[in-house]
Regions:
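Short catalytic-loop micro-motif centered on adjacent basic/acidic residues
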Residues: 53-55, 76-79, 103-104
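Short, Lys/Arg-enriched N-terminal segments with co-localized hydrophobic residues
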Residues: 1-8
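Active-site-lining helix/loop region of Rossmann-like oxidoreductase modules
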Residues: 9-26, 30, 48, 123-169
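Short acidic low-complexity segments
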Residues: 36-50
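Beta-loop-alpha module in the N-terminal Rossmann-like domain of NAD(P)-dependent dehydrogenases
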Residues: 48-71, 82-87
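Rossmann-fold NAD(P)-binding glycine/threonine-rich loop
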Residues: 67, 80-102, 109-123
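A short helix->loop->beta-strand "cap" motif at the edges of active sites that frequently abuts
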Residues: 72-75, 97-99
Length: 169
């Protein structure tokens, strides 16, 4: 599917690791234009012609990247994990500025179905004799964040659904 010229977007990519490179390939195949690629320090003036920023950088950089984009009036889709404690502040700034900000720890349809199933099962199993939820995460050796954002989300959803679980470790 290739968008018509009126649907094509001018994109900025912040973070050009494996995921950023995949996003770039897909965006170009779909007819979008990459206006900026940043893999470190960047200037908000480079967002002048950008409709949307896609951010897959590092946890220590994500908050600054997202807030710079929002202050520049550019919508942000962020998939960087590991900065959960600062996401509420980014959401607050977004609301104050009337901006657009979407965060997800995982964009896979299958994993998002897993999130829903995890919550649904935990709610129904809570209180059942012998129900003792346990998570174990296994990744390839090049995985940068551990635990992953996906594992954290699964654990947080279990904590919300199961009364006797107060925290994860």
């Amino acid at each position: 599917i290739v968008p018509s010229n009126e649907l094509a977007m001018n994109l900025a990519l912040i973070g050009h690791g494996k995921m950023g490179q995949q996003v770039e390939r897909c965006a170009l195949e779909l007819g979008h234009s990459i206006q900026m690629i940043a893999n470190g320090q960047w200037d908000s003036a480079s967002l002048k012609r950008v409709d949307l920023t896609i951010e897959f950088s590092r946890p220590e950089a994500a908050f600054e990247n997202v807030t710079k984009c929002l202050r520049a009036g550019v919508a942000v889709v962020c998939g960087t994990t590991g900065w959960n404690d600062k996401i509420p502040a980014a959401e607050k700034l977004c609301k104050e500025l009337g901006g657009s900000f979407l965060f997800a720890s995982n964009f896979s349809i299958g994993v998002n179905l897993l999130f829903a199933l995890n919550k649904w099962l935990a709610e129904r199993m809570d209180g059942q004799a012998g129900f003792a939820p346990e998570l174990e995460e296994i990744h390839h050796e090049h995985k940068l964040d551990a635990p992953s954002g996906t594992a954290i989300r699964l654990a947080e959803d279990l904590i919300q659904a199961v009364d006797r679980i107060g925290q994860w470790k």
